[in-house]
Structures are given as C-alpha cells and as structure tokens.
Amino acid sequence: MVRKTKGIVLRAVRYGETSLIVSVFTEDFGLQSYIINGVRTEKKNKETSSLFMPASLLELDVYHHEQRGINRIREAARYKVLHSLSEDVVKNNIALFMMELLFKSLKHPESNLPLFHFCEEILCRLNDGDRESASVFPFYFSLHLPHFLGFGISSPEKTIYD
C-alpha cells in the first residue's frame, strides 16, 4: 500500500553497484529502512542521490508493509531545502552528529510525533542560524533528546547543572 509521509534521512549505505539502503525517521512510521534501486547510475542525475544525504527533510511516497524490514520508496522530494547545512562544514558535521545520535537512540519502528517535530525544528534552526551559535546545538540536542525517549529530566525546580 502506498502511503505519503514526511521523513528525516539519518543515514545512507551503498548497496551493490547502483542502490542505496536509507534509514529514515518518518513522521508516521518512526524509524524505517528503504532500498532505492538504480539511484547511483550515470543516467540518474546527481540531485537524485543527494536527496538521501543525512539530515535531508523529505516528503515520501512509500510502499509500506508492517512485516518487512526494508521497504521501497516510490517517490521522494525535498519539502525544505537546507542549503546552509550542505555548504557549511561546521553545520554539516553538527547535523551528522545529531543524526547519528538519533539513529543510535531509535531501535523500534514506532511513531514519535513530538520527537519528529523537535528534530525537524532543530535542523531548520541550525540551517537558519549563524556559524557562531551552531556550537550550542549538539549540547541542546543531547540534553533534550532523552526527554522525547522517556527518560529525560522532568523536575522544574532542579537545574541540569548545580
């Protein structure tokens, strides 16, 4: 069944000569793996393979089956272009750190809308912010991620650092 969802690319791994296996944190299904055949051929333009770079915000049409470990993507397009993340090396590395931390933290394919919207917002803020303020994002993301996973600091009267 074809379903429409938004997703954040966490990682892409080459598979065979022309394919990619992409881990995507989706709005509706949580962490999912998708195989994209023929994306790395010479006939395809480079823009198609660049869609699946980590920290890309995509709108996806996917063939979703609950029982399968790896599904297929019918169509993918960016719904928010993050130019600054791809051009600035510092911001790119910060985004890669956050995507890797998120990938290592998510183990089950379950939807987590607040976490998805938090990640989407923090990537947009990192993209729109200046380079000097970018150094705060890894700490901010690391401190707030546990809250969305169910074991964060919840006491308002205690500070994080005493």
Please identify what each model-predicted range represents:
Residues M1-S19, F25-D162:
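Non-catalytic alpha-helical scaffolds and adjoining flexible linkers that form interface surfaces
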